[in-house]
Amino acid sequence: MSAESAELKVAHLDADAFYVSIELRRHPELRGLPVIVAGSGPRAVVTTASYEARKYGVGSAMPAARARRLCPQAVVLAPDFTTYREASREVMEIVRAHVERVEVVGLDEAYLDLTGLFSPRAAMRRLIAEIGARTELTCSVGIGPNKLVAKVASDAEKPAGFVVLTREQACARFAQAAPGLVPGIGPKTAARLAELGLTTLGAVGAAPESALVQRFGPNLGVELGRRARFEHDGVIGAARKVVSESRERTFDYDVSDPAQLRESLQTMTDELCASLHAHGRSGRTIGIKIRLDDFSTATRAHTIEAPTNDVERVTSVALRLLAEYAPARPVRLLGVRVAGLTSDAPVMLAVSTDADAAGDDDSNEVLDQLSLRV
């Protein structure tokens, strides 16, 4: 085994603007133009946008109406999830022909175990070249000693990036980056870190563990410090079966207005159903979660006859459950969930990367959320 292969154990491969790139294969005349893939309904959300559209602030999960306002000249295409799943299978078949152990974490991304490869860099160069030649898709690759370094590296120079980092190099390169660069540290967690004066990854990584533990508890406090130092022990394994998917929102202030609660719930069901549709998943049990201002928590669920990922169906059930519960106190957190999922498609395990968005529950639950993607 070479010294390189001993240090560089994991690659993260991420297809660039996956849905848009597939559409551009069918519509090459649109190359170089701002393109948005989104539904056409009044509450449709963006599934992905070309890099030309992203320059205008358009991003995934954004309401399509807002995306059109930000970039009125964009070409908007309806999503074709059947074609996207077929393209994903094609890409992952190529990946598995090059690397024995692969953990698929989405239609467009996977972790690859590079252990035993004599030259990981050369192997990954050959892989992305073959993917490009056979599918006309570009991929960004990050290579490192663990999944966390590989993931952040693959995002660093998109599109068509190829970044190789040791853990020490990652610490140096991203020392001045905001904590939210690292999966598992979302906006609310970053705000809580800022209250301690910790506004960069370098500062979080160098902070006394006791200070983090005092603020976040023994499990999350230790984990945040480790992630900021790009320390990670997760192993690459086969994708686990997902049995449910959810969206939750912790409000900036307690909400009593029923109309605002309904609007928030509708937005979350839009995002949730777009993800279910994208990954070929449907479920029978639809539920809501409500946490009140006194931190009491209630859940309500209803099981329908046949699995669905239809946004109108899921929204209808979720809104009915909310109306039946009729919270008597202001609401701190609201969530929606679809369970009993069935799917043959590759899975995306995580939904939330923010500790606070995960529901202000105990640290063990938060850590479960943080560990899903990396």
What are these regions (language model features)?
Residues 1-223, 342-374:
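Gly/Gly-Pro- and Ser/Thr-rich, intrinsically disordered tail segments characteristic of DNA damage-repair
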Residues 3-5, 174, 181, 189-333, ...:
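DNA-contacting surface of Y-family translesion DNA polymerases
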Residues 109, 333-335:
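Extracellular/lumenal ectodomain signal focusing on beta-strand-rich modules
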